[in-house]
């Protein structure tokens, strides 16, 4: 029976040695990660969601000329937010619109510009390695072809876009080895077109 305590002691010793060999982040890195984790603001995220909802509808086929209603207004506001965030970090973000004309599809029968907004934070050591955070801009009611009715889309997917904006605000204050792409995608409810267009670029 004396072998059992010895076996248990040996197992514990081996486990502690294995744990000691696992590399841990240096204290400075741990402090940065703690700061990042504590930085998101529920108030800012809610304000962004409410702003996106205020455009009435963000349907892919909706109004693009108005500055207060439709997907065009939402796109311009998101682009401006990315630019504002970039200005606060000394131009650390490349803000671009990526789009294409889609037509002849069941949910996009007529020629329609599907435009997504990207903010790219280039990596310092491995810029060809990408991490992408995205939310889709567009919203819809039950009838996927109804582009005039209000479709606030707070949970599908204004909160995803708001989370992406908040991530850009926080992470752009730091430098990372790889590249981070913050993306607000259009045309997702009509067939994931925004993501496809961005991936093709």
Where are these regions (language model features)?
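Bacterial N-terminal signal peptides
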Residues: 5-16
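Boundary at the C-terminal end of the N-terminal hydrophobic targeting segment
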Residues: 18-21
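Extracytoplasmic/secreted proteins, especially bacterial periplasmic and envelope-associated proteins
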Residues: 28-35, 40, 44-47, 51, ...
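Second-shell loop/turn segments in exported
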Residues: 31-40, 58-72, 104-108, 146-157, ...
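A non-catalytic alpha/beta surface segment that caps or lines the substrate-entry region
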Residues: 36, 47-122
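Loop/turn elements at helix/coil->beta-strand transitions in domains of secreted/extracellular proteins
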Residues: 43-47, 89-93, 126-131, 176-181
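Solvent-exposed loop/turn segments at secondary-structure junctions
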Residues: 57-60, 101-105, 124-126, 137-141, ...
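Acidic/histidine-rich catalytic neighborhood of metal-dependent amide-processing enzymes
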Residues: 108-115, 141, 146-201
């Amino acid at each position: 029976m004396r072998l059992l305590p010895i076996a248990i002691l040996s197992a514990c010793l081996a486990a502690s040695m294995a744990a000691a060999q696992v590399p841990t982040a240096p204290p400075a890195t741990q402090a940065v990660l703690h700061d990042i984790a504590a930085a998101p603001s529920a108030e800012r995220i809610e304000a962004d969601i409410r702003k996106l909802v205020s455009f009435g509808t963000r349907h892919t086929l909706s109004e693009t000329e108005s500055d207060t209603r439709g997907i065009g207004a939402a796109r311009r506001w998101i682009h401006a937010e990315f630019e504002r965030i970039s200005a606060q970090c000394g131009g650390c973000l490349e803000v671009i619109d990526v789009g294409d004309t889609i037509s002849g599809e069941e949910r996009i029968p007529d020629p329609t510009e599907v435009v997504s907004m990207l903010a790219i934070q280039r990596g310092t050591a491995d810029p060809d390695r990408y991490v992408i955070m995205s939310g889709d801009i567009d919203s819809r009611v039950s009838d996927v072809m109804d582009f005039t009715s209000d479709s606030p889309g707070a949970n599908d997917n204004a909160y995803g876009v708001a989370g992406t904006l908040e991530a850009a605000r926080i992470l752009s204050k730091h430098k990372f080895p790889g590249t981070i792409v913050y993306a607000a995608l259009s045309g997702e409810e009509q067939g994931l077109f925004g993501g496809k267009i961005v991936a093709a670029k």
